[in-house]
């Protein structure tokens, strides 16, 4: 059994804990029945003893496999990690979604993606990463009780993500400590109006107005101050033709959306200016989690 989950970029500027989309950079897990527990890890984090334990995956998989009355006692898990870890590209959400999908598949229980998404909410209380990880595409999502309500828009083939991955992390926990407990009404309205406008632009494919819609006053600049180079990343990407340039999740990765014809120029400029950072040019993903 192969489980494949895409990386995701959440918030997209003003859509704090609400908006997200999937990009074609995938973690894969092969699961096979075995006489004893066996783990192998390749790619991102393969040299990190904590990552190699895959504790979060195993905890969620075992809990749900047991809940679903699975019969096998042990499995061999082969992890291929391509999503940078703790960089704001949804690596934790990918683990959660993969573990749940794997538990259902190996237990032989039929399920739909909405069920996986609602189960994922038990482990990740914000829907902005888990929703595109499950569904693919661009998603606007909210939580009511123990359910995620979301709307998906498929992304066109002529757009690409230019993703800048810094050489150090900004932890989600730390990044939340820099946010105020209270916001001024003007800040809230500024970002709320742009999140609504951005959603309309994505749904209508009005890409050339995203530069206005992607501005934010709630979280982005406050978090970027923890890594000031990110202001220069954003400025250069927009100068070179990015449609929008936003902090990915809580960082430290920066997400840039662009027309395919502009991506080489944007990526080359970013690589030349920031040689210490990794730059990926990625297709956008419309499939979400895949089980086969």
From Swiss-Prot:
Localization of this protein: Cytoplasm
Single Gene Ontology MF annotation: homoserine kinase activity
UniProt-listed Enzyme Commission number(s): 2.7.1.39
GO cellular component, one term: cytoplasm
Pfam family, one: GHMP_kinases_N
Keyword set includes Kinase: yes
Known pathway: Amino-acid biosynthesis; L-threonine biosynthesis; L-threonine from L-aspartate: step 4/5
Keyword annotations of the record: Amino-acid biosynthesis, ATP-binding, Cytoplasm, Kinase, Nucleotide-binding, Threonine biosynthesis, Transferase
Residues the record lists as binding ATP: 84-94
Reactions catalysed, as given in the entry: L-homoserine + ATP = O-phospho-L-homoserine + ADP + H(+)
GO term, biological process aspect, one: threonine biosynthetic process
InterPro entries, per the entry: GHMP_kinase_C_dom, GHMP_kinase_C_sf, GHMP_kinase_N_dom, GHMP_knse_ATP-bd_CS, Homoserine_kinase, Ribosomal_Su5_D2-typ_SF, Ribsml_uS5_D2-typ_fold_subgr
Primary role: Catalyzes the ATP-dependent phosphorylation of L-homoserine to L-homoserine phosphate.
Similarity comment: Belongs to the GHMP kinase family. Homoserine kinase subfamily.
Database matches in NCBIfam families: thrB
Protein name according to UniProt: Homoserine kinase
Source organism (scientific name): Sulfurovum sp. (strain NBC37-1)
């Amino acid at each position: 059994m192969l489980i494949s989950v895409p990386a995701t970029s959440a918030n997209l500027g003003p859509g704090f804990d609400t908006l997200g989309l999937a990009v074609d950079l995938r973690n894969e897990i092969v699961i096979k029945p075995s006489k004893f527990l066996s783990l192998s890890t390749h790619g991102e984090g393969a040299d990190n003893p904590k990552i190699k334990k895959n504790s979060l995956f195993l905890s969620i998989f075992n809990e749900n496999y047991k809940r679903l009355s699975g019969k096998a006692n042990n499995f061999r898990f082969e992890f291929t990690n391509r999503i940078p870890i703790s960089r704001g590209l949804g690596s934790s959400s990918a683990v959660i979604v993969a573990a749940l999908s794997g538990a259902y598949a190996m237990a032989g229980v039929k399920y739909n993606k909405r069920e996986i998404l609602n189960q994922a909410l038990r482990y990740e209380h914000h829907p902005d990463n888990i929703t595109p990880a499950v569904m693919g595409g661009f998603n606007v999502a909210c939580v009511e009780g123990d359910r995620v309500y979301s709307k998906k828009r498929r992304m066109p083939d002529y757009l690409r993500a230019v993703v800048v991955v810094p050489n150090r992390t900004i932890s989600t926990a730390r990044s939340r400590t820099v946010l105020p407990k209270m916001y001024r009404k003007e800040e809230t309205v500024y970002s709320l109006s742009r999140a609504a406008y951005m959603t309309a632009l994505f749904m209508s494919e009005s890409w050339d107005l995203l530069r206005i819609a992607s501005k934010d006053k709630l979280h982005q600049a406050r978090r970027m101050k923890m890594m000031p180079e990110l202001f220069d990343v954003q400025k250069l990407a927009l100068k070179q033709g990015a449609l929008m340039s936003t902090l990915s999740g809580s960082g430290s990765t920066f997400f840039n959306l662009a027309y395919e014809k502009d991506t080489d120029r944007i990526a080359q400029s970013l690589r030349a200016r920031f040689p210490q950072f990794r730059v990926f040019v990625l297709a956008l993903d419309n499939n979400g989690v895949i089980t086969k």
